[in-house]
Amino acid sequence: VLGNTFHLWLRPGLDVIARHGGLHRFMNWSGPILTDSGGFQVWSLGDLRKISEEGVVFQSPVNGDRLFLSPEESMRIQRVLNSDIAMVFDECTPYPATRNEAALSMELSLRWARRSRVAFDAEDLGGGVVDALRESPSDAAADAANQAAGRPSNGLFGIVQGGVFEDLRERSLECLLEIGFEGYALGGLSVGEPKEEMLRILSHMGTRLPTNRPRYVMGVGTPEDLVEAVSQGIDMFDCVMPTRNARNGWLFTRHGDLKIRNARFKDDLLPIDPECTCPACSPESHGDDRAPFTRAYLHHLQRTNEMLGASLATLHNLHFYMQMMREMREAILRGRFEAWRRDFSGARGQGIE
């Protein structure tokens, strides 16, 4: 899961998370956790922030306090959060931006990336684990170093910026590779640019990212976006879409998207997707002998703003995304990705019954 460094820093604050020993115990989650650097949230504050070489001064959206965030402070906060993957502090290049504006922003992000790397290593977030990951991409090497060091594996990912300019993106990646990171992300996508521009940069940069490190696209996207990105070699994604859309009654299915608030579903006795095995569509698949929740019931819950409606929709959408990614991994292993992709696209275009 992804932890939002900026918001966790403000609420509940680092003290309470530190007393738990980090996010894993705080949220009772034993799986991997990635934390962003806070850069995107600071960028989104607009007029409430002021950027300099040292970092960003901004006004807290919670209580109006004047706060300062820098590469070093971001690394310190992420150390307290104790995530498995930390992200460098960067400036998200806005759209639209001139080539000169994008270049200046990208160069600032590179200087901040170097400072993030130094601060990350000095904070001993990774120690021997980071060194082992640099020398070998194998899990065994990382696990051995982790065991010897007596601490969890942690890694720092670099973020490629440069807006919609391919040569700037290439320079950003080249410099990040010189610094050296445990993984590489494409940032500054899906920030208002046309879909064609996003796909062009993704196509240009996806296969240029190193194949012996995790490749991550930040803030993307629709099911179709993820399929396209995987075809370009991308491994990891984060996006609010499955959960935010769920809260608004927008459900993803194998045969297209379903807007459960629409009147046509008021009396519909089918589950969201009869082929789905999520807890909402198929409780029996999860040891529950109840019948599936019907579209009519989900329609009622959404229309009356009942919390259960958002919860069931979220479970469904997350299950859909996880199942889609699982199928893509299996198709790649079997050498059938393109065939799977055609079938998936065809089914998604059929529409909901």
Regions found by a protein language model. Give the residues of each.
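Conserved, mostly hydrophobic/aromatic
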Residues: 1, 36, 78, 158, ...
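Non-catalytic, usually N-terminal nucleic-acid engagement modules in DNA/RNA processing proteins
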Residues: 2-130, 139-147, 257-258, 263-266
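Short, solvent-exposed loop/turn segments at secondary-structure junctions
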Residues: 7-9, 40-41, 93-94, 163-165, ...
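Alpha-helical packing segments of well-folded alpha/beta enzyme cores
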Residues: 74, 105, 109-112, 116, ...
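C-terminal extensions of enzymes
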Residues: 90-96, 273-353
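Glycine- and acidic
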Residues: 94-99, 103, 183-189, 307-310
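Glycine-rich phosphate/ribose-binding loops and adjacent secondary-structure elements
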Residues: 107-110, 119, 123-133, 138-146, ...
